[in-house]
Amino acid sequence: RNHLDGADRINRELAELTVGRARLTGGDMSPTGLFIEPFGDATFDEVVGIYAEQASALDASGVDFFIVETNISLQEVRAAVTGIKQVSSKPVFVTMTVDDHGRTLSGDRLDCCLVALAELGISAFGTNCSQGPDKMLELLRSLVQLSVSLGIPLIAKPNAGMPHENPDGSRHFDLDAESFAAFAPEFLASGIYILGGCC
C-alpha cells in the first residue's frame, strides 16, 4: 500500500504542474498486469476498483481527460473504463496494443474492441506501441468507416519502427524524428486525427 500512496502523490504532483496551462492534461493509465478470471486470478470488480482508485486521484489533480493505453485485453480495458466512469465524467481515450494482424495478446480484434468500448462511452480509440507508423496506418485505415459511424475519433501512437540492437549493445529505431513526423499527413488524410508517439 505504501508504494501506491507514493504513486498517487507523484501522479498528483505531475498533473498539478500542467493543469491550467494552455494545453490539455491527460491522466495516463496502463495495464495492471493482472488477468481477469477465467484467464487469471483477478475478478472484474477488483480490477474496476484498482482503476477507480487511480482515476479518483488523477481526477482530483485536475486532469482534463484519461487515456488508458498499451492494452492487451478487452476484458481489462472494459474494467478500466468502468472504474474511471464510476469516479469521473471526464473523457476517456483508449489505445490497444496489437500484432500485425490487428489482434491483442488476448486475441481481441480491433473492430470488436472499438464497438464494445463505444458502448461504454469512450471518447476516442486507437492503437499504440508494437508497430511503426506504416503498419499502424494500415491497421487504423480499416477502422475509419466504423469509427465515423460510431462518432469515435481514432488515435495513432506508433513507435519509430521496432528497436534493433547495435553491436555495442545499444539500441536504435528504424526511423529518425523527421522520417517519423513525415507520416503525420498520411494519418490526417486517412481520417486519423489524434496523433502521438510511443516508446
What are these regions (language model features)?
Residues 1-199:
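Domain-level signal for soluble alpha/beta catalytic cores
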